[in-house]
Amino acid sequence: MATFDDAYKILMKNEGGYVNDSDDSGGETYKGVSRRYNLDWKGWEIIDNYKRSYRRKALCKVLDADDKLQSMVKTLYKDKYWDVFDLDSIPSQTIAYQMFDTCVNCGETAAIRFAQTSLGERVTGHWTLNLLNKLAAIHT
């Protein structure tokens, strides 16, 4: 079965540290967590406190060294993008990771629509047990 920890390790290789790029549609982000799309995430309080005392390079180092913040990042990804789809029940780590990564980068509805389209399902944008079962039946 797929495991979140394995998927998270791959995701973290692809997601950066702290960025506040006005040209990025996600706006201010930390490890891929967009403030714009995760306004209520408590990790922003920690980041904002550090921003008062540290500039860019030092800020990235201190954020990455904060164990509580790292735990909060991991929990957000697990709760919002992994557990919501019950990806632990998919046998293929590759398929589970693709669903997870697509959800992180495109949003839940888009990820569901992509999966429905690729599996010949009626495209509703809603997660269903049938879709989960079809994903679970794919062996890579």
Predicted features and spans:
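Cell-wall polysaccharide-cleaving catalytic domain and substrate-binding groove, primarily
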Residues: 1-140
